[in-house]
Amino acid sequence: MTKTMLRALKGETLPTPPIWLMRQAGRYLPEYRATRAQAGDFLSLCYTPDLAAEVTLQPIRRYGFDAAILFADILLLPQALGADLWFETGEGPRMSTITDMAGVTALKGRDDIHETLAPVYETCRILARELPKETTFIGFAGMPWTVATYMIAGRGSKDQAAAHKLKDTDRPAFEALMDRVTEATIEYLAKQVEAGCEVVKLFDSWAGSLKGQDFEDFAVAPAKRIVSELKARFPGLPVIAFPREAGEGYIGFAEKTGADCVAIDNSVSPEWAAEKVQAGRTCVQGNLDPKYMVTGGEELVQATKRVVEAFRNGPHIFNLGHGITPEADPENVTLLVETIRGK
């Protein structure tokens, strides 16, 4: 097996960790901005296979990352389920809201999502053909809790108050929504794999707001269900889970869910994560602070070396603790890659 990313996901400790970055196709790259302008708007870019494939390939051409991640958005799935979705300039995504059981039952079934998502699958097929043979192709979806927070509130929020309120005041409606999203997520990811994705990543951006039993019920349990269902259909499929800001919840997350790798944010130190999460055997992904992609310089070099050193005694995929920001300097990414690969 020559793909370093797949070797790490199978538990191999490598002398140089494979590297890719969350949001590596993004606004910090001039070529991305040009392609997005050509598309007209963000959703058109997601739903135009040639252009979505192009922006996925751009950072691979520029940096030679070990993995490419499908260019899409976690909110395409709720849109395919029937939610209205739009993006407001400077404000981010907006959606129609679901506040009760009637809203849940009005959603489409899991087998009715594929017409809307067909362009995403076509993007996957293009990339499976065009990516370099050494580059691993990652598909992805949002985890049910995070997707549900947007569907309930109609927008992102810092505290996910609307979702917590529905969870605590109308548990049947909340659980029905989680079930509907979980089932659809399984079908969506299965289609991505059938179209050529070699790995899938589960993004639970707001997992950190789930505490105690809620974390077990609504972060761990849905992840376990999705992972087990996908692995039953696609034996050997590697899965990366990212329960962002889970803190102590990162410990044992891979074992509890069946994920092959747990991605870690930069709110925990690499040394803590190496001891408590990686423990010499569990593949971890992370966890450089994205700020260094803006600031650069010797600080970037030293922080990068610290992450590599912390995780060098077990399987590790180098990434950031969160997505690269639009303010990042493309030259700092070059410096990052050169530092890791010892050039």
From Swiss-Prot:
Q: What is its main location?
A: cytoplasm
Cite the CDD domains for this sequence: URO-D
Instruction: Name the keywords, alphabetized.
Output: Cytoplasm, Decarboxylase, Lyase, Porphyrin biosynthesis
| Binding-site positions, substrate | R23, Q24, A25, G26, R27, D73, Y150, S205, H322
Please name the pathway. Porphyrin-containing compound metabolism; protoporphyrin-IX biosynthesis; coproporphyrinogen-III from 5-aminolevulinate: step 4/4
Which Gene Ontology terms describe the biological processes this protein takes part in? protoporphyrinogen IX biosynthetic process from glutamate
Q: Which residues form the signal peptide?
A: none
Q: What class of enzyme is it?
A: lyase
GO annotation, cellular component aspect: cytosol
Assembly, in brief, is: Homodimer.
The entry assigns this protein to a family as follows:
Belongs to the uroporphyrinogen decarboxylase family.
What is the name attached to this protein's record?
Uroporphyrinogen decarboxylase
Q: Which organism is it from?
A: Cereibacter sphaeroides (strain KD131 / KCTC 12085)
